[in-house]
């Protein structure tokens, strides 16, 4: 019978969390970990369900399983039972020291876990268990399999040589295409691409990682020209549509300038870029199954991945499975930036010890070391901004504060001055209007340039102006979140007659960011645009597409948000003339060294940190350490 009483009642995520939490006995060990905010009720629910299926009700095993379930949720690939007591971070509002929770002794814990029917022991243990223990590292089995697959694939590629090349052609090309490479590192990276099937090019912003792609590909193409072979097939990919578009743009811009044959130039200009998901051909209705995989591999001779730091371990596993074993794989990125929002810190794990040595001596380290080059020279910015980025990356709080103290700002002219790394020492969460006047002034000044160009219908000028300033936030919501600061910017604009006379949320000069890929419009998650006036069609949203501009009716845009401010995560892969970083309080768990470094290095010319010294030091002193076994597998 279908009637009002038979209709299902919608259950929200909060309802489900509350329901699961009510089933956790508060005085049990698991209940104490739940109250401390280390384990979510869902972690415990899954652990108990697995225990029932495996007929194992040992509470120590249940705790280990719940922590392994939790691990990917907070970015880890595994839980290391030998260190979790020191590395766990309590997440409740109660002042709970994780060290005071009822942790079992390691010896007893490992003994119980090894004896559980739920858990395979060792890399060669049974394949039919949901979890696997390797040493003290406990994995959900699929993450162990992904890590194993990536390690085996990259080790094999690093040990294999690429097809034979003409060394004389390469030598001449290196001199011609890298005339200013005083360190020799860019030439080293290019040589690796030609000689090996795996190349990793790492380094900070402005070190020439992306622009060197065109030169490397030109060298590969010149080998084909000299031997009469066709040009290689190439896939340029990145984790997001925005990063892919920037990669293609960089390759095309560089191709127009290079001293190369016209045939090679035309070939480079014909290359396009896509997201990794689109390259692999994601199957509808699933995030982990793709058209291309081990039994149906990609047809490309060279696969180049930019912004590799944003890739999760599962996605990297799918990619290496799909790339032909005789194809060249080139991974590019900054291992110090924010890692994927999902499990793993793949690029950092791969680079490993090479992060501090540039390239390890071949007689000391395994084959992976011969495939890695860490670029050092910065061509984008200098002065205090470069000093600040280096100090943050190094975790030197005193050096960070020394740079900021030299550029300390106060009063109405706080965002002016000679230093390109400045500091507005206020608590963002409670700041009053007067103390925020410097930020308000900067937003209004920058937006006036956008609005003037938008009113004139000059889309390129409006988009150029949009890249002059961006507010960056650690959070999406809350008093220091991007949502709050977008609203604040609109209020400031409304106060001077420039802001929303709102019509469905659209107004002249509104900056917007796309939040979902729209392949029909050719717009991708992370693309930014601006609303301009067009004589015949009224308001249009203008976006860059390659070297040109495309304008779209606002009615056709669904998944967009206002973008005076954005999260640091969303800003990855982008750069602006000036960024204003609005820091949360020191207690924020997302305030990390990697987040601050990523925020600071979005600036081309200058950065302003807005926040207290406590917040700055807290970020610098809180590096992200994601639990993983990939470095150990690759480097030994």
Regions found by a protein language model. Give the residues of each.
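Residue-level signature of catalytic and energy-coupling elements of molecular machines
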Residues: 84, 150, 240, 275, ...
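N-terminal pre-P-loop "Q-motif" helix
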Residues: 179-195
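Conserved helicase motor core of P-loop NTPases
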Residues: 336, 340-512, 518-521, 532
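ASCE P-loop NTPase helicase motor core
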Residues: 187-188, 196-409
């Amino acid at each position: 019978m279908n009637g009002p009483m038979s209709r299902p009642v919608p259950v929200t995520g909060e309802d489900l969390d509350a329901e699961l939490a009510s089933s956790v006995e508060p005085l049990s060990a698991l209940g104490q970990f739940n109250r401390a905010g280390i384990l979510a009720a869902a972690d415990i629910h899954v652990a108990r369900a697995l225990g029932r299926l495996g007929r194992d009700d040992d509470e120590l095993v249940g705790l280990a399983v719940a922590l392994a379930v939790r691990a990917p949720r907070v970015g880890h690939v595994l839980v290391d039972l030998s260190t979790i007591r020191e590395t766990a971070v309590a997440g409740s509002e109660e002042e709970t020291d994780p060290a005071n929770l009822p942790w079992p002794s390691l010896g007893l814990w490992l003994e119980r876990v090894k004896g559980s029917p739920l858990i395979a022991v060792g890399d060669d243990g049974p394949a039919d268990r949901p979890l696997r223990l390797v040493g003290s590292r406990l994995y959900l089995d699929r993450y162990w399999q992904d890590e194993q697959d990536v390690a085996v694939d990259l080790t094999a590629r690093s040990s294999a040589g690429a097809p034979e090349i003409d060394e004389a052609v390469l030598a001449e090309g290196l001199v011609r295409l890298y005339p200013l490479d005083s360190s020799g590192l860019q030439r080293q990276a290019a040589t690796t691409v030609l000689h090996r099937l795996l190349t990793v090019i790492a380094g900070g912003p402005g070190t020439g990682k992306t622009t060197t792609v065109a030169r490397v590909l030109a060298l590969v193409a010149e080998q084909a020209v000299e031997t009469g072979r066709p040009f290689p097939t190439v896939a340029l990919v990145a984790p997001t549509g925005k990063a892919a578009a920037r990669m293609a743009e960089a390759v095309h811009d560089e191709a127009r300038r290079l001293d190369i044959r016209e045939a090679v130039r035309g070939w480079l200009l014909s290359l396009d870029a896509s997201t990794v998901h689109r390259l692999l051909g994601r199957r509808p209705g699933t995030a982990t199954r793709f058209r291309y995989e081990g039994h149906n591999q990609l047809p490309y001779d060279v696969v180049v991945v930019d912004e590799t730091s944003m890739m999760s371990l599962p996605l990297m596993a799918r990619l290496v499975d799909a790339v032909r074993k005789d194809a060249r794989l080139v991974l590019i990125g900054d291992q110090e930036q924010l890692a994927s929002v999902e499990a793993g810190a793949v690029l950092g794990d791969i680079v490993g010890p090479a992060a501090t040595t540039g390239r390890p001596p071949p007689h000391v380290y395994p084959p992976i070391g011969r495939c890695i080059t860490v670029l050092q020279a910065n061509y984008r910015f200098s002065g205090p901004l470069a000093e600040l980025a280096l100090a943050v990356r190094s975790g030197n709080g005193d050096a960070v504060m020394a740079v900021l103290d030299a550029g300390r700002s106060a009063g109405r002219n706080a965002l002016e001055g000679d230093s390109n790394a400045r500091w507005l020492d206020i608590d963002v969460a409670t700041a009053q209007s007067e103390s925020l006047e410097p930020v308000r002034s900067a937003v209004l000044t920058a937006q006036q340039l956008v609005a003037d160009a938008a009113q004139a219908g000059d889309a390129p000028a409006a988009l150029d102006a949009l890249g002059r300033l961006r507010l960056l936030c650690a959070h999406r919501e809350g008093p220091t979140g991007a949502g709050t600061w977008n609203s604040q910017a609109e209020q400031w604009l409304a106060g001077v007659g420039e802001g929303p006379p709102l019509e469905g949320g659209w107004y002249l000069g509104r900056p917007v960011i796309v939040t979902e890929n729209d392949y029909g419009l050719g717009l991708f998650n992370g693309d930014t645009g601006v609303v301009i006036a067009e004589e015949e069609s009224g308001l249009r949203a203008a976006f860059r597409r390659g070297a040109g501009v495309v304008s779209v009716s606002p009615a056709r845009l669904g998944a967009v948000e206002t973008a005076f401010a954005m999260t640091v995560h969303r800003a990855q892969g982008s750069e602006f003339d000036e960024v204003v970083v609005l820091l949360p309080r020191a207690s924020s768990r997302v305030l990390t060294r990697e987040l601050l470094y990523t925020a600071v290095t979005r600036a081309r010319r200058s950065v302003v940190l807005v926040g207290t010294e406590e917040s700055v030091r807290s970020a610098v002193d809180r590096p992200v350490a994601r639990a993983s076994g990939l470095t150990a597998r690759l480097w030994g």
